[in-house]
Amino acid sequence: VSTSSAPARPARPARPALPFEQPRPVEQSQRVRSSPAAQPLDVDVLVVGAGQAGLSAAYHLRRRGFVPLGPDGLPSAGLDDGASPGDRRTFVVLDAAPAPGGAWQFRWPSLTMAQTHAVHDLPGLALDPGDPRESASTAVGRYFGAYEQVNDLRVLRPVSVREVRDDPATGALLVEATTPDGPATWRARTLVNATGTWTKPFWPWYPGRETFAGRQLHTHDFGRAEDFAGRRVVVVGGGASATQFLLQIAPHAASTTWVTRREPVWVGGPFDENRGRDAVALVDERTRAGLAPESVVSVTGLPLTPVYEAGIASGVLRRLPMFSRVVPDGVAWDPGVRPDGVTHQGADVILWATGFRAALDHLGPLGLRGPGGGIVMDGPTVVADPRVQLVGYGPSASTIGANRAGREAVRAVLRVLDGAASRDGAAPYDGARPVVPGPA
């Protein structure tokens, strides 16, 4: 996320709704009733995750005529298109979160819509600009919930996928999950994985980190700035979250210290849709070159808004080089690292705003990772197993990229279902490249 001075975009003109976009009286959170003895529920496409990438994929499945299945494995109530159940291709969307909103619902309450990079429209439904002061977790959660209902996506939640493995007898994928009512299993011909990164916070290792006597927390754990009252806080990370935390914490904390590996790059002007598309293109160019994607801010830079200018002038956003090690009472630099010659900073709290990694542990049994630990991709398709599409990573990690990746993933799904690709017979691709890096 990043602070932006861009004005709110006006709502797009209304357009006629597609047939499947008519509102239906469906539940937003549907329960799966199952038991350890239950037979697998068969489905053509299983979408795991209901953030922007997963919802985009589900939308494009609907456009292609796929029918969403409910928790009982049956098509939507009221569906009457004249086709017999066996003639319809089906999909299911599973989401581990308790409510609509993807990872946005877990963001800290003080993150407002005005402070985020532009949240781009999901396909087929414009986001009402609303109040820029509203919490992003509330606004985006409401938008995603409306999107699920308008498109009758029948998202099943909370469902946590434990494991995806091959079923040699059928050539399908067995997806084992945990629901509030017990275990459940789906047998899917293809899988669109959109589990994101929020559940995999990245904690870099530095010498002595385990010796620190104070509190260590991650962006994932941030709550309120008031929680840091009277504390000496070291914030680690060069992204937008780190700078937002510093500005919020500084009025309450005894002191704040900002450390990064690289000098921050400040960029003037609003972060509009054109800049967003340029950023996606730069990330895509890097992954096409066979390189792991870097952080978002390494591509976009930090927006030099009046709020940030004031933070720089006040000294709150004064960046220091990364410390050399953690000590029980703070952090330490080797002699000569800091320009001012200081070698020690006392701290009560270290806040690691150091990003996230792809949440893909449940795919481990499929053996998708190569010798270096990364997963080689062709667009959203896993080269080692074309039945699996990964969306919401690398170039598709933004709301712009996620929308495009959802569409591309559905095209790839159709190739698999039409027999053009399988685990043992992948369709030709235009040069394999690692998009999802291995575990750190």
Regions found by a protein language model. Give the residues of each.
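Glycine-rich flavin
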Residues: 116-132, 286-288
